[in-house]
């Protein structure tokens, strides 16, 4: 829909063919306004969640999630403005039997060429998020340590049926760098849209596109398999286990 839509009074519907698809606006002289979007299948994950007042223990494991369970957790904990993508496999990060976060791989073909920036082949990190609320400031980084672990690398190689050398992902940010990935991932490239930095967010940006309409689009990459899950947990405890 255009900001200055001369047919706005005749807008009767909006639909999407996929969750990530562009909106299709329908105009008519009559009829009841409707919105039609794809239905997302969800189910509760049968696992306890980490929470406030709890301490991170020492037994860290990976737990493969069903797609429906992943959809539920993503809807519960992730930014609502991030459009759902299709995950090849979603993985829960569990410490002492409690879910502390989730990440997901996509094995879909990509036209991106990262061989000049990082070792290939690569696997795409579609999604990563911690559970909330918690007392730890940087629990999101523990999810990333798990995603980059030797155990995670083996899972990535199993689902892609090829070697997985590096993990790549994309962040949209108001700043030149995302603090979540800083220190673990390196910047592969960065796109800057100066017009978005100057945009009036109260009227120029559609809330449905808010997450993606940031001044910076940053592609990140990091080698996989540099530590085991236990080693990654130990590093996180040493560097990032500060509380709020």
Where are these predicted regions, by residue range?
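Nucleic-acid-interacting cores, centered on viral/eukaryotic replication and modification enzymes
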Residues: 24, 61-65, 98-101
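Residue-level detector of beta-propeller blades
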Residues: 11-16, 99, 187, 192
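Acyl-donor binding region in acyl/amide transferases
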Residues: 3, 87-88, 107-224
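A short acidic (Asp/Glu
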Residues: 6-11, 73, 102-104, 177-184
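Conserved beta-hairpin
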Residues: 87-107
């Amino acid at each position: 829909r255009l900001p200055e839509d001369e047919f706005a009074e005749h807008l009767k519907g909006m639909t999407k063919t996929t969750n990530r698809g562009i909106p299709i606006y329908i105009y008519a002289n009559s009829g009841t306004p409707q919105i039609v979007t794809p239905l997302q299948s969800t189910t509760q994950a049968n696992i306890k969640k980490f929470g406030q007042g709890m301490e991170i223990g020492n037994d860290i494991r990976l737990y493969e999630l069903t797609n429906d369970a992943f959809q539920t957790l993503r809807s519960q904990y992730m930014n609502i403005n991030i459009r759902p993508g299709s995950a090849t496999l979603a993985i829960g990060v569990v410490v002492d039997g409690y879910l502390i976060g989730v990440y997901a791989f996509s094995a879909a073909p990509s036209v991106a060429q990262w061989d000049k920036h990082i070792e290939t082949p690569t696997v795409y990190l579609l999604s990563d998020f911690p559970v909330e609320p918690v007392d730890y400031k940087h629990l999101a980084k523990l999810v990333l340590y798990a995603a980059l672990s030797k155990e995670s690398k083996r899972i990535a190689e199993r689902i892609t049926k090829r070697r997985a050398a590096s993990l790549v992902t994309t962040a949209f940010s108001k700043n030149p760098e995302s603090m979540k990935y800083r220190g673990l991932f390196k910047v592969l490239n960065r796109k800057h849209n100066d017009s978005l930095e100057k945009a009036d967010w109260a009227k120029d940006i559609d809330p449905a596109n808010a997450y993606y309409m940031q001044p910076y689009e940053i592609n990140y990459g990091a080698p996989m398999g540099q530590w085991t899950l236990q080693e990654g947990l130990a590093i996180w405890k040493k560097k990032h286990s500060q509380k709020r």
